[in-house]
């Protein structure tokens, strides 16, 4: 920006979007996405940090955002009646946190709490959904990437369930 004006020029705004798009391109979840689509997503993103023990969301609450973790870990948990919160999985650097924002009724399936200090890109879910609806190629790319994450996590859950089910009674 010029020293006499607080309003950025068009060139400066484009540069800011490009820098953010470049930062997004470095995240494994978005690896290989076109620069144009990264710029569209960058416009809906912001850099955020969370301290350890900060609750990002509760299960069954509205899913209005999602995150791409840059550093730190987040624990997914679930409230089990009569037992309290049960840890389900740990999400770390390079991973997507949140997929419920993409599918109606847009409510979190799990809760999430920062297990350590976390740095992430935070996205406005409504904006990203609208942009995906307006650009079917972007929508396909985002949905395909989320589906890949869901498939991986389902397989991980399957392995954990098998491990738990073969343990002798009383060991759990």
List the model feature ranges, each with a label.
Residues 1-172:
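Cytosolic regulatory regions built on CNB/CRP/Popeye-like sensor folds
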């Amino acid at each position: 920006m010029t020293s006499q004006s607080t309003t950025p020029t068009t060139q400066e705004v484009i540069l800011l979007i490009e820098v953010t798009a470049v930062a997004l391109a470095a995240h494994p979840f978005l690896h290989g996405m076109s620069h144009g689509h990264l710029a569209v997503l960058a416009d809906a993103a912001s850099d955020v940090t969370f301290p350890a023990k900060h609750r990002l969301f509760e299960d069954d609450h509205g899913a209005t955002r999602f995150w791409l973790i840059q550093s730190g870990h987040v624990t997914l948990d679930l409230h089990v009646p009569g037992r309290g919160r049960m840890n389900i999985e740990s999400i770390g650097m390079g991973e997507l946190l949140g997929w419920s924002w993409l599918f109606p009724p847009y409510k979190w399936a799990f809760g999430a709490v920062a297990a350590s200090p976390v740095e992430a890109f935070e996205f406005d879910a409504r904006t990203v959904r609208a942009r995906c609806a307006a650009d079917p190629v972007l929508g396909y790319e985002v949905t395909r990437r989320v589906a890949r994450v869901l498939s991986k996590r389902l397989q991980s859950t399957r392995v954990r369930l098998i491990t738990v089910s073969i343990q002798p009674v009383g060991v759990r």
